[in-house]
Amino acid sequence: MRHLLIATLSLCVAACAGKVDYIRPTAQVAPSSNVRLVERPRDAVWNSSVPELGKQFFVINNLDKPSGLMNISYTGDPERYIDCGKITSYVKNAQGERTYNFAGAKAQQSYEIMEPSAGLFFLDRRMNLEGRVNLIFEEVGPNTTRVTANTRYVATRTQTVRNVANNFPQTSTESISFNSGGSASFPANSKGQSAECVSTGALEREILSAIK
């Protein structure tokens, strides 16, 4: 019986394998991607921007025309506006081989990881993004307006991990924040690995494209 148990364990070790790879984000943002010059008076640009932005999926939180400050926000799918790298998980066991490839900013992903010393784990990974944007309307000249979009990003990651051996789920939620053109990393895992997220400039470009 003892020899049979050892043989079974040896077979499992030989047949079970897993590896998780992480590629850091590659997005690069041009320094001027959050600024737009409009050849119209400031009041005219402001007056046309309010209804135009209201038609989009952004929420207008605050309007202060005398100071030229408008605050709008976005909440939803992070993959549209930030880059959190790429994740690949390879699993091999008695059920066969599986490979999961997905963007780190993907809103939801279910996958598996295999830890040689702990066994197979099922993961449900969810990402959410909140972007708060300050739009500043500045008069450069009588018929020229400079509009600057400064964003504060808050990315939230919620992970539920379930060990196949005991089927007991554990959930953790972590948030990071960074500004336009910046980046931040989630806390490192037990292996010292941490996922990084960077802004791509797409949110600022999309907002500024609506201002004419």
Give the role of each language-model region.
Residues 9-10, 77:
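Residue-level signal for mature regions of secreted extracellular proteins and peptides
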Residues 12-15:
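C-terminal motif of bacterial Sec signal peptides marking the signal peptidase cleavage site
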Residues 17-212:
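Ser/Thr-rich, low-complexity intrinsically disordered terminal regions
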